[in-house]
Swiss-Prot record:
Protein's name according to its UniProt entry: Probable transcription factor At4g00130
GO aspect biological process, one term: regulation of DNA-templated transcription
Family of this protein: Belongs to the GeBP family.
Superkingdom of the source species: Eukaryota
Key words, A-Z: Transcription, Transcription regulation
Signal peptide stretch: none
Length: 194
């Protein structure tokens, strides 16, 4: 367990994207980070099992109506593993479960509810999104997060947060299109080999 946790920590330091397990299957860049002998298949299998454990923990927590802070662990190492898994496969520290059913169900039409909702300050999550981008540009992470926390709540801050959300959505769309294109390319290569 200790070796796997170290591997995950190193993966997080090495890459800033959340598709570490996908990148691992495509290259052996993480092979150098491992202190023990393991084949590519063993590493991939280990990561797949870890992701499955993470998804199961998320599903169980959701069934119980718990958040990530309320989930109880038998061992401290399990908590550390779960925290690392959230950083890799989670979404801004929010528990995300995969689709449980394989059937496609037609979505029900929902009428938008009219409520007096207050704007929730999501500055911390926006600050987290800025940190990887800023650190890749050579900016100090701690100054970015503390600087964003010091900005007063207001219309201008909400406008910037909305722009970051739109940017994040566009980035996800681009990553999805890239994975579809990669899948199509691999299918063409496989077809050419056979």
């Amino acid at each position: 367990m200790m070796r796997l946790r170290r591997l995950l920590e190193r993966m997080l330091r090495r890459c800033c994207f959340r598709d570490c397990s996908v990148r691992l299957t495509k290259s052996l860049c993480f092979k150098k980070l491992i202190e023990f002998d393991a084949t590519k298949n063993q590493i991939v299998t280990k990561l797949q099992r870890l992701k499955k454990k993470f998804n199961n923990a998320v599903k169980n927590a959701r069934k119980k109506g718990q958040t990530e802070d309320e989930v109880e662990y038998a061992k401290e190492s399990e908590k550390k593993r779960f925290d690392l898994s959230i950083m890799i496969w989670g979404s801004n520290g929010v528990l995300v479960a995969g689709k449980s059913s394989k059937k496609k169900v037609a979505p029900k039409e929902m009428k938008p509810e009219e409520t007096d909702a207050k704007v929730v300050n999501e500055g911390l999550s926006i600050g987290r999104e800025m940190v990887p981008f800023g650190s890749s540009c050579g900016l100090d992470e701690s100054k970015l997060t503390t600087g964003w926390e010091n900005v007063e709540d207001g219309a201008e801050k909400r406008e910037v947060e909305e722009k970051w959300k739109k940017f994040k959505d566009k980035l996800f769309e681009l990553l999805y299109e890239r994975s579809v294109l990669m899948n199509k390319t691999e299918a063409m290569m496989f077809k050419a080999e056979s």
